[in-house]
Amino acid sequence: MSTNTTTTNATPELAKESVFFQSNHEDLKNRPKVRGYDFNEGVDFSKLFETYKTIGYQASAVGEAIDEINRMISWRLVDEPLKEGEDDDEERKVTRCKIFLGYTSNLVSSGVREIIRYLVQHSMVDVIVSTAGGVEEDFIKCLAPTYMGEFHLEGEKLRRKGLNRIGNLLVPNDNYCKFEDWIMPILDQMVEEQKTKGTVWTPSRVINRLGKEINHEDSIYYWAWKNDIPVYSPALTDGSIGDMMYFHSYNTPGLVLDIISDIRAINNHAVYSKKSGMIILGGGVIKHHICNANLFRNGADYSVFVNTGNEFDGSDSGARPDEAVSWGKIKLDAKPVKVYSEASIVFPILVAETFAKTFKKKSPEELKLNKRSIFD
């Protein structure tokens, strides 16, 4: 055993140099200082959320997401310099960023549905992508309610009672029976129109028709139909709608869905937009579908992702925005934001500090400019 340890009263130089290592402040000159909200100033939610950017961690990401969405909302073509051959006409004054909104089914099952409905009701977004569950759950809620439950409720007991659990929400199985009673006659009409009128049904056209038929102001897709906002669902059969189509194919066979027309339509929404923005809640097919459409314009200009996914498994859901930059799905000079959070916590805050604050009804000219042509 070594016995060369020397004990002195002087502090070892190595210890001092290691602990009191001098900082180079050059990289800190333009960085904001960490500071949270002072509740001595009273309760002011706008000021509170403004301080999120300097709180740190995911609060800072929320603050950055608020800024990114506000950039989407505020952009106008008329503010850009005229390019050679362009006219400074009325269309430039009403041309805005085209906003793509994507969300997974669990958010429509939750109370986030009402927030999404608000955005669609007031034409605040231009293109929607949802999973099948995000479509059917909206219609089912118009027919019967979803209830609060608990995460720990036992699956076996719930199954015996005919109660389906979505996290800490409960959906009586009777709701899906009511959904079947409502949708089957509509599917019959679709088959008839396909045969007699030559109607080509796409997932977006089906959702549009169902939005019209539900005729309920609580519905996201009622307002999407009314405001002519396209809703794409590339995996429309992956849910209760698919279950209904399965049963319907035995009773009234022949319904055909054309997915090629929809992929052309959503890609062209991106291709022909002057600026595009993506707000994506959750991951999976909805995230990739929107990002991939924006590849066709060499990337979105503005992007906000909200999900709990991590990138270590190589999943698209967990991928950071920088990975999308490498694929050409987000612009090289963009300032995308990912918030690592469950969307039901964050999205109400984002909407409160962006869309709801700047709400102003779009002019007829603005609405006309964003209308789709897929159903023409």
From Swiss-Prot:
InterPro entries named among the record's database cross-references: Deoxyhypusine_synthase, Deoxyhypusine_synthase_sf, DHS-like_NAD/FAD-binding_dom
Q: Name one GO biological process term.
A: spermidine metabolic process
Class of the enzyme per the UniProt entry, highest EC level: transferase
Instruction: List the molecular function annotations (GO) for this entry.
Output: deoxyhypusine synthase activity
Q: Which residues form the active site?
A: 329
Give the residues the record marks as binding spermidine: 136-137, 243, 288, 314-316, 323-329
Described function: Catalyzes the NAD-dependent oxidative cleavage of spermidine and the subsequent transfer of the butylamine moiety of spermidine to the epsilon-amino group of a critical lysine residue of the eIF-5A precursor protein to form the intermediate deoxyhypusine residue. This is the first step of the post-translational modification of that lysine into an unusual amino acid residue named hypusine. Hypusination is unique to mature eIF-5A factor and is essential for its function.
Q: Tell me the protein family, please.
A: Belongs to the deoxyhypusine synthase family.
Q: Which NCBIfam families match?
A: dhys
Q: What is this protein called?
A: Probable deoxyhypusine synthase
Q: Which organism is it from?
A: Dictyostelium discoideum
Q: What is the lineage of its organism?
A: Eukaryota, Amoebozoa, Evosea, Eumycetozoa, Dictyostelia
